[in-house]
Amino acid sequence: MTNKYLVEGSENELTTKTAAELAGLIHSREVTSREVTQAHLDRIAAVDGDIHAFLHVGQEEALNAADDVDKRLDAGEAPASALAGVPLALKDVFTTTDAPTTAASKMLEGYMSPYDATVTRKIREAGIPILGKTNMDEFAMGSSTENSAYGPTHNPWDLERTAGGSGGGSSAALAAGQAPLAIGTDTGGSIRQPAALTNTVGVKPTYGTVSRYGLIACASSLDQGGPTARTVLDTALLHEVIAGHDAFDATSVNRPVAPVVQAAREGANGDLKGVKVGVVKQFDRDGYQPGVLEAFHASVEQMRSQGAEIVEVDCPHFDDALGAYYLILPCEVSSNLARFDGMRYGLRAGDDGTRSADEVMAYTRAQGFGPEVKRRIILGTYALSVGYYDAYYLQAQRVRTLIAQDFAKAYEQVDILVSPTTPTTAFKLGEKVTDPLEMYNFDLCTLPLNLAGLAGMSLPSGLASDTGLPVGLQLMAPAFQDDRLYRVGAAFEAGRK
């Protein structure tokens, strides 16, 4: 199977080039940022009726930003960043002053933020035009974008299948040539999982290294913004733009940004000699789709052929990660989403003079939240209630500690861990929507990393022999060693060419 949207469907070659290539053309003045940005806007107009990657397209704002870059470059100024002039798609969970921020929920339909998220600000300061805001599961809760209040995103590899979630819109935009760069968020796999399903690269940075200021919270101890693109180098270049300490975010870590771009360039020689790669036993077993395991084993053998030493690693508490995650996350959701009450911003429903303030709040939340968001609020409220807090929430936090300890012990033996990113390739839209447990299981391989706050990457590892659909290889690195992902990821990418 091929992705016709990149292989056959792009009439303008600018929409198939990498971000690094586009930056080189723009900075040498062979093309203008306006030309590149307009090509991608035209691409969105041509194919987004099929894909539904975008919830909002800001044509005027994007072209104005591109013109500003061109003006500065024509005046002889140095580029504001290595990606200046290259347009980007932004997940609709980061606040923007010039476009609606909805988190794909009716609760925030049409909401205009009075401030930019720190990630948004850094993108603007880097001279990167924002094409628009991408589709997602409502408040980042879901694995398929089917929880979006505005309809699901379709996978460019097969329009009947999911592009993943929660950030399926960002990854689908990359895979369809609608954007060369995109930003997502990862709470339990929402960057890495869509990347795997769409044959793109997605990175969850170490928790605290990318600011969460202006990121609409799902679960504050798990959420992390991150970069996604079509190559490892492009992803590294974007990572460098958005990372760094932010005084507006109390969870932001004040330490130097890992040398991710340097690592990606060094890894491009394809040499993995001296690298110890750990294969997580818990993620390499029966029950996964045969084509996924076949591609994963081939990837491990490729790394061995590139000089890596392969070691099997046992992380016994990973088996308990799913249960712990789906207790901790709803508890944080029930607290974070209490702010959406219809009183200060967003939707207000039923305020017709016949209801009390409490009744208006209850009615607003009933009308504004979708079924999955309501499910998680109820579950979290229950788990935090008197008599259940110790039995559920505290137990889940203890498991979280054990998972972090499993990772720590593993990194005493190896430099990096690997697993399939997802247990199967992209499933058909509607296939799991009535079975929450089946949907939750799809994040089995990605969520342990969020519980431990570590760094992870998904990158293409071929097509499954049984479905012909993309398979992702997940790399997992210790905290603040994000550069390891890029060094190993770039080497693996080079070995596949």
Swiss-Prot record:
One of its GO terms (cellular component) is glutamyl-tRNA(Gln) amidotransferase complex. HAMAP family: GatA (MF_00120). The gene is gatA. One of its GO terms (molecular function) is ATP binding. PROSITE patterns: AMIDASES (PS00571). It holds the Pfam family Amidase. The active site is at K91 (charge relay system), S166 (charge relay system), S190 (acyl-ester intermediate). Belongs to the amidase family. GatA subfamily. The lineage of its organism: Bacteria, Bacillati, Actinomycetota, Actinomycetes, Mycobacteriales. GO terms for biological process: translation. Its EC number is 6.3.5.7. Keywords: ATP-binding, Ligase, Nucleotide-binding, Protein biosynthesis. The keyword Oxidoreductase does not apply. This is Glutamyl-tRNA(Gln) amidotransferase subunit A. NCBIfam families: gatA (TIGR00132). It catalyses: L-glutamyl-tRNA(Gln) + L-glutamine + ATP + H2O = L-glutaminyl-tRNA(Gln) + L-glutamate + ADP + phosphate + H(+). It is an enzyme of class 6 (ligase). Allows the formation of correctly charged Gln-tRNA(Gln) through the transamidation of misacylated Glu-tRNA(Gln) in organisms which lack glutaminyl-tRNA synthetase. The reaction takes place in the presence of glutamine and ATP through an activated gamma-phospho-Glu-tRNA(Gln). It comes from Corynebacterium glutamicum (strain ATCC 13032 / DSM 20300 / JCM 1318 / BCRC 11384 / CCUG 27702 / LMG 3730 / NBRC 12168 / NCIMB 10025 / NRRL B-2784 / 534). Heterotrimer of A, B and C subunits. Residues 143-171 are annotated as: Disordered.
